[in-house]
Amino acid sequence: MSNYRRGVGSYSRMLGGGTNPFAAYTARKAKTKKRVLDKYEIIGYIAAGTYGRVYKARSKDPGDTNQYAIKKFKADKEGEMVHYAGISQSACREVALCAELDNRNITKLVETILEDTCIYMVFEYAEHDLLQIIHYHSHPERKPIPEYTLKSILWQLLNGVSYLHQNWVLHRDLKPANTMVTSDGVLKIGDLGLARLFSNPLQSLYSGDKVVVTIWYRAPELLLGARHYSPAVDLWAVGCIFAELLALRPIFKGEEAKMDNKTNVPFQRNQMQKIIEILGSPQEDDWPSLSKFPEYESLKQMKTFPPNLEAWYQSIGGTNQKGFQLLSRLLEYDPAKRLTANDALLHPYFTEAPKVSQNVFERQEYKYPPRRISCEDSDIKTMTYQGTKRGSQGGDNLHPRKKQK
């Protein structure tokens, strides 16, 4: 034991750490560690969500001309006080998955920076997203998205989803706002905070999740209370996005019934109503497991409708029959019959003219406006440490402070 103590003492003195043999090492690491603002210049604020905030930035390295999106995860708050209970489950999941995924149609994680009590994920920057593109084509007047653009967007989206599923990842939150497009016309699936590996037994949609997927893109099996689910939930969302690109508005725009608490999940009657008004009421002949869902009795109490998807397709000006066939296969009620991402990529819709392109903007005669960036954001002017109130100044400030007059 005495030899052990002498050895530890010698090691400690060698490191200059006194009683803590790793103190000097920790101090050296702290001195050499680059902070976010040491490496990046913040251009402006992009958006906020339940996870935190996203900023547009450029590298301070003169040899790096790229732009980046920096995602800052916020701390848990309780009233006016801020408590740091560690990194959230969503952040851990997104960091772990993004570090492993490598595909042209998945947003690339450049690096992760852990600084004081904040975690920052630095992603490649995309100038556009599908929500912005849809808005451009629907305001102030309706301008349909050209078929070659729409087809290329859909193909690249399916290609990214196929890659996720081949690597046993469910995205679970696909929607236009989470689907980016670079200035070079490359679609990027982003926001993997709700993604799950599906090689393990899956939990219910709400188990362990603070965030609930936007119901407009939620598959019917989830609305009916499915406890376990498959990659087919992502393909339903792709079908909804396809329809929205065609119509320039959500196909199933229901009103969400709010949860009273985490264990009492209400039946989303209005959302289900929007679906059956277009697809018709689901039947056990077409969906054998229908009666096994927890909300089956609630479904039986709803008014019945005949199938109306073809009429809806014609009402929005849809004329391509192969496009309609693909849409109807993505919006199958029975998840077992829904197309997989791989099968969808091989659909005849993509083999007929106009052919898909790796640049969704190819052949376009106009340019979409750049993403709106705000230089005013109260959060980036504040710093919070444990036991302090919001608004105190400190090193968490992502935006250079304005000079005091």
UniProtKB/Swiss-Prot annotation:
Domain Protein kinase intervals: 40-350
Protein name, as recorded: Serine/threonine-protein kinase SSN3
Catalytic reaction equation(s): L-seryl-[protein] + ATP = O-phospho-L-seryl-[protein] + ADP + H(+); L-threonyl-[protein] + ATP = O-phospho-L-threonyl-[protein] + ADP + H(+); [DNA-directed RNA polymerase] + ATP = phospho-[DNA-directed RNA polymerase] + ADP + H(+)
Skewed-composition ranges (Polar residues): 381-391
EC code: 2.7.11.22, 2.7.11.23
Positions annotated as active site in the UniProt record: 173 (proton acceptor)
Localization terms from the record: Nucleus
Membership in a protein family: Belongs to the protein kinase superfamily. CMGC Ser/Thr protein kinase family. CDC2/CDKX subfamily.
Region (Disordered): 377-405
PANTHER family assigned: CELL DIVISION PROTEIN KINASE, CYCLIN-DEPENDENT KINASE 8-RELATED
Molecular function as annotated in GO: ATP binding; cyclin-dependent protein serine/threonine kinase activity; metal ion binding; protein serine kinase activity; RNA polymerase II CTD heptapeptide repeat kinase activity
Keywords for the protein's UniProt record, in alphabetical order: Activator, ATP-binding, Kinase, Magnesium, Metal-binding, Nucleotide-binding, Nucleus, Repressor, Serine/threonine-protein kinase, Transcription, Transcription regulation, Transferase
Stored CDD domains: STKc_CDK8_like (cd07842)
Needed co-factor(s): Mg(2+)
Main location per the UniProt record: nucleus
Function: Component of the srb8-11 complex. The srb8-11 complex is a regulatory module of the Mediator complex which is itself dependent transcription. The srb8-11 complex may be involved in the transcriptional repression of a subset of genes regulated by Mediator. It may inhibit the association of the Mediator complex with RNA polymerase II to form the holoenzyme complex. The srb8-11 complex phosphorylates the C-terminal domain (CTD) of the largest subunit of RNA polymerase II.
Native organism: Yarrowia lipolytica (strain CLIB 122 / E 150) (Yeast)
Lineage, highest ranks first: Eukaryota, Fungi, Dikarya, Ascomycota, Saccharomycotina
Annotated binding of ATP, by residue: 46-54, 71
